[in-house]
Amino acid sequence: METIAKHRYARTSAQKARLVADLIRGKKVAQALEILTYTNKKASALVKKVLESAIANAEHNDGADIDDLKVAKIFVDEGPSMKRVMPRAKGRADRILKRTSHITVVVSDR
């Protein structure tokens, strides 16, 4: 049984979050949580929260045994970017893109 959890509009770039997602793809959830706990990245806290939500969904909604669960799929898609202006010298301005991402975690007992 596959169970899904999503975090939409996460305030991190998809490129940075994918580095963390690649670390836990295909691992058992206990091992994945341990890896995320000791990974020193902002995105690891966001991914860990989504993984914990997926585990809770599997246990509560599907009655799955936590010991059998593994990270079947994890992917990070780009969300919309917030456009901001950074004033520069001589009256110029640069556009700053504050990027967001959609983090999706699928856990499975198979």
From Swiss-Prot:
GO terms for molecular function: rRNA binding; structural constituent of ribosome. One of its GO terms (cellular component) is cytosolic large ribosomal subunit. Pfam families: Ribosomal_L22. It comes from the Bacteria. One of its GO terms (biological process) is translation. Keywords: Ribonucleoprotein, Ribosomal protein, RNA-binding, rRNA-binding. PROSITE patterns: RIBOSOMAL_L22. InterPro entries: Ribosomal_uL22, Ribosomal_uL22_bac/chlpt-type, Ribosomal_uL22_bac/org-type, Ribosomal_uL22_CS, Ribosomal_uL22_sf. Gene3D superfamilies: Ribosomal protein L22/L17. HAMAP family: Ribosomal_uL22_B. Belongs to the universal ribosomal protein uL22 family. Part of the 50S ribosomal subunit. This protein binds specifically to 23S rRNA; its binding is stimulated by other ribosomal proteins, e.g. L4, L17, and L20. It is important during the early stages of 50S assembly. It makes multiple contacts with different domains of the 23S rRNA in the assembled 50S subunit and ribosome. This is Large ribosomal subunit protein uL22. It comes from Aggregatibacter actinomycetemcomitans.
